[in-house]
């Protein structure tokens, strides 16, 4: 079955092409740390031959606690992104939370991301669609895979069909997430075979019911990522940090930066194997 290709500059993203890595840090903690993390990702992905897009947030507007670190903000964040692009020649993905942010962010980065908690907000979707940028839609934890076609349709109505879908788990009772591996193929089907990627970092979140920040299951990142890659996906979304225990956001789910290369070697091996298989239709 023909898969839709979404191009991020010279990077082609599709379910039947070699996977693209969307990776970096959860939030911009500082200019220097962003440079360090980006350089490491670029070095490793170039060595392994993996297409790469750097990820970081300039503002985490959905933190659990009013006291949690949010990021440097729009103006300073865009300056850091511009420096990363100039220094490393890297493509960049970041999220927007308000319609007014869409165009200023799209003027700097290569992919703008619709956060899971906001994925049904039509005004935000319309503003993002109008930019003409490549869009990454995070599937809300409370939305079934089959409902993602409606969100894609909103972007199409806004004149933008350059849409990537991203699964980051589904609510499983209170304060826990699980990943439905059957959901990936459903998301492909309802979106006209748009690229589907897997955010393994945020799928590992597991909250303390009474805590002010998300917990996580970093020790299980490799197992969960292996399972997702075995489905046959367009890309993998992974955040890493040189010192996860002291990261300002989602450290418990972050991959230790020093483990990035061996981790990606495994992901590439699985991706190469799965995409070497002939398509097998078992529906009839």
Swiss-Prot record:
Keyword Methyltransferase: no
Catalytic activity annotation: D-arabinose 5-phosphate + phosphoenolpyruvate + H2O = 3-deoxy-alpha-D-manno-2-octulosonate-8-phosphate + phosphate
Locations listed in the record: Cytoplasm
One Gene Ontology term, aspect cellular component: cytoplasm
GO molecular function: 3-deoxy-8-phosphooctulonate synthase activity
Keywords in alphabetical order: Cytoplasm, Lipopolysaccharide biosynthesis, Transferase
Pathway assigned in UniProt: Carbohydrate biosynthesis; 3-deoxy-D-manno-octulosonate biosynthesis; 3-deoxy-D-manno-octulosonate from D-ribulose 5-phosphate: step 2/3; Bacterial outer membrane biogenesis; lipopolysaccharide biosynthesis
Broad class of enzyme this protein falls into: transferase
EC number: 2.5.1.55
Gene Ontology biological process terms in this record: keto-3-deoxy-D-manno-octulosonic acid biosynthetic process
Main location (coarse class): cytoplasm
Domain of life: Bacteria
Assigned protein family: Belongs to the KdsA family.
PANTHER family: PHOSPHO-2-DEHYDRO-3-DEOXYHEPTONATE ALDOLASE (PTHR21057)
Name the record gives this protein: 2-dehydro-3-deoxyphosphooctonate aldolase
Gene: kdsA
């Amino acid at each position: 079955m023909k898969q839709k290709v979404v191009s991020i500059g010279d990077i082609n993203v599709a379910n039947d092409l070699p996977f693209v890595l969307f990776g970096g840090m959860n939030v911009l903690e500082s200019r220097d740390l962003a440079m360090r993390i980006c350089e490491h990702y670029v070095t490793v992905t170039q060595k392994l031959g993996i297409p790469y897009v750097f990820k970081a947030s300039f503002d985490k507007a959905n933190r659990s606690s009013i006291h949690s670190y949010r990021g440097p903000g729009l103006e300073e964040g865009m300056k850091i992104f511009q420096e990363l692009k100039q220094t490393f020649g890297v493509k960049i993905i970041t999220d927007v939370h308000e319609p007014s942010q869409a165009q200023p962010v799209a003027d700097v980065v290569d992919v703008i991301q619709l956060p899971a908690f906001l994925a049904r907000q039509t005004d935000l979707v319309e503003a993002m669609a109008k930019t003409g940028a490549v869009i990454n839609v995070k599937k809300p934890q409370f939305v079934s895979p089959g409902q993602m076609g409606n969100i894609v349709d909103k972007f199409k109505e806004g004149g933008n069909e350059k849409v990537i879908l991203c699964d980051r788990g589904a609510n499983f009772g209170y304060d826990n997430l699980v990943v439905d591996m059957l959901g990936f193929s459903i998301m492909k089907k309802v979106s006209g075979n748009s690229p589907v990627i897997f955010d393994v970092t945020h799928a590992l979140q597991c909250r303390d019911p009474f805590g002010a920040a998300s917990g996580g299951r970093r020790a299980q990142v490799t197992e969960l990522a292996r399972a997702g890659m075995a489905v046959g996906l367009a890309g993998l979304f992974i955040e890493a940090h040189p010192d996860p225990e002291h990261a300002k956001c989602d450290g418990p789910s972050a991959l230790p930066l020093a483990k990035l290369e061996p981790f990606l070697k495994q992901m590439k091996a699985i991706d190469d194997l799965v995409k070497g298989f002939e398509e097998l239709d078992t529906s009839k």
